[in-house]
């Protein structure tokens, strides 16, 4: 459960992402594909090379979903319901992959905003991304 301090940290950190959200989403996906090659199996139709338009497009979708989750942090189950259905029933993404992408997002954010990535912010973002992952996997049961 996110505390009021966690929610404040997440909103402040995501606010600093600003117009770079799509770029950071794409960078996190590239990082995930390089670090965890098995995740590529969900994207057989994508050009997974550095800077590909498909990875950038999906990175923007990821970032937009996270922006929505930040904005509706107190109602994430409703905010992410359609994505949960999509990933559970149509795409059938293994839930562990959400943890892998979350880790890559944290690394990406830390690389771009090292001064802002304090231990407290890191912990809050980690809890937030874990909450997002929990919501996205809730319809698997």
UniProtKB/Swiss-Prot annotation:
What GO cellular-component annotations does this UniProt entry give? Answer: blood microparticle; haptoglobin-hemoglobin complex; hemoglobin complex
List modified residues, type N6-acetyllysine: 16
List all membrane-crossing ranges.
Answer: none
The chain residues annotated with the modification Phosphothreonine are 108, 134, 137
Q: Which residues carry this modification: Phosphoserine?
A: 3, 35, 49, 102, 124, 131, 138
| Leader peptide range in chain numbering | none
Q: Tell whether Metal-binding is among the UniProt keywords.
A: yes
Name of one Pfam family that matches: Globin
The N6-succinyllysine modification is found at: 7, 11, 16, 40
Q: SUPFAM superfamilies per the record? A: Globin-like (SSF46458)
Found in which tissues? Red blood cells.
Gene Ontology annotations of biological process type: hydrogen peroxide catabolic process
Q: Name one GO molecular function term.
A: peroxidase activity
Q: Please name the InterPro entries in this protein's record.
A: Globin, Globin-like_sf, Globin/Proto, Hemoglobin_a-typ, Hemoglobin_oxygen_transport, Hemoglobin_pi
Question: Any idea which positions bind O2?
Answer: 58
Residue span(s) of domain Globin: 1-141
Identify residues that carry Phosphotyrosine: 24
Q: Where does heme b bind?
A: 87
Coiled coil start-end: none
Q: Which keywords fit this entry according to its UniProt record?
A: Acetylation, Heme, Iron, Metal-binding, Oxygen transport, Phosphoprotein, Transport
Identify its protein family: Belongs to the globin family.
Subunit relationships? Heterotetramer of two alpha chains and two beta chains.
Task: Give the protein's biological function.
Answer: Involved in oxygen transport from the lung to the various peripheral tissues.
Q: What is this protein called?
A: Hemoglobin subunit alpha
What's the source species for this entry? Saguinus mystax
Q: Which gene encodes it?
A: HBA
């Amino acid at each position: 459960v996110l505390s009021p301090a966690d929610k404040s940290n997440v909103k402040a950190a995501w606010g600093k992402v600003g117009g770079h959200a799509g770029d950071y989403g794409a960078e996190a996906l590239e990082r995930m594909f390089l670090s965890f090659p098995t995740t590529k199996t969900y994207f057989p139709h994508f050009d997974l090379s550095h800077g590909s338009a498909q990875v950038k497009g999906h990175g923007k979708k990821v970032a937009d979903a996270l922006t929505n989750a930040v904005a509706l942090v107190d109602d994430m189950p409703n905010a992410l319901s359609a994505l949960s259905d999509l990933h559970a029933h149509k795409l059938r993404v293994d839930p562990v992959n959400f943890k892998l992408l979350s880790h890559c997002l944290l690394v990406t954010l830390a690389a771009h905003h090292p001064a802002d990535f304090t231990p407290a912010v890191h912990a809050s973002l980690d809890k937030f991304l874990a909450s997002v992952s929990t919501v996205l996997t809730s319809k698997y049961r």
